[in-house]
Regions:
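N-terminal auxiliary segments of SAM/dcSAM-dependent transferases
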Residues: 1-70
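Conserved beta-strand segments of alpha/beta enzyme cores
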Residues: 31-33, 59, 131, 158-160, ...
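Conserved SAM/SAH cofactor-binding pocket of Class I
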Residues: 83-166
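Hydrophobic residues in well-ordered beta-strands that form the structural core
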Residues: 61-62, 134, 212
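Short beta-strand element of the conserved SAM-dependent methyltransferase core
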Residues: 1, 79, 246-250
Length: 252
């Protein structure tokens, strides 16, 4: 923060934001601490920890790194998340990647709820999907997705991104559209998935696939129950470390 920043006012806004978020998930004790620390380039400092890595036959690398010689035969995805979420390194993202790969066809239209950097929609297009739509609450997701799609050679005619809360914003729901998606993917917190699932059923085509993650293992049954309660058939539950992905189908 700048020297003249009003820390108390900022903390108040943080509390207000947490109040809003608590409508969708349990935030625990919500303890907030503040203090002074050394001034560093925090926006870019994290980049030293983001190195090229593989997910099965896919090489995911930051835009500022070169392709390792031993991985030049892999499907290449380049990512610069900026301030949006999504490098692909987290177990939940990798769980979603594998399920998207499994269910994507050349006719697939995919909706990515909470798209962040755009990595999941981008990979669906790399796997051969026809069109991708992403939604996010963070305005940074638009710029990050457009930049990442461009650096990966994906045409603007193949995707779109919109900002808004699809759970309770009818305008966003209408803009996204109903009954038009072969796949809906949501890599979000489990408690948000519980609220999202009954809404997202309307966006899926009959026979469409719903891929979820962001689920810690002790929340697995909560999400499975929400998926079943929405009338979806659970097809698979997959695991990586302590994280879970639930994949279901809308039968019509």
């Amino acid at each position: 923060l700048d020297d003249d920043a009003d820390a108390e006012e900022i903390l108040k806004k943080v509390e207000e934001g947490l109040d809003e978020l608590s409508l969708f998930t349990n935030l625990g004790a919500r303890t907030i601490t503040s203090g002074e620390t050394e001034d560093k380039d925090w926006i870019n400092n994290w980049k030293q920890y983001f190195k090229p890595f593989t997910v099965d036959h896919i090489l995911i690398k930051p835009t500022w790194e070169t392709v390792p010689e031993e991985h030049k035969d892999k499907l290449l995805v380049q990512i610069d998340p900026g301030t949006a979420f999504g490098t692909g390194m987290h177990e939940t993202t990798q769980l979603c990647i594998r399920q998207i790969r499994k269910y994507t066809t050349p006719e697939t239209t995919i909706l990515d709820v909470g798209c962040g950097s755009g990595i999941l929609g981008m990979l669906a297009l790399k796997f051969g999907a026809k069109y991708s739509v992403g939604t996010d609450l963070d305005p940074c997701a638009i710029e990050a997705t457009y930049e990442n799609m461009e650096v990966n050679g994906i045409s603007k005619e193949m995707y779109e991104v919109m900002i808004g809360n699809i759970i309770d914003d009818k305008d966003v729901q209408d803009k996204v559209g109903y009954g038009k998606y072969d796949i809906v993917v949501a890599n979000i917190l489990a408690d948000v998935l519980v609220a999202l699932t009954p809404v997202i059923v309307d966006q899926l085509k009959d026979g469409g696939i719903y891929i979820t993650s962001g689920i810690i293992d002790d929340k697995e049954e909560t999400v499975v129950e929400a998926v079943k309660a929405a009338g979806l058939e659970v097809l698979e539950v997959t695991y990586q470390g302590e994280w879970v992905s639930v994949t279901a189908r809308k039968n019509g």
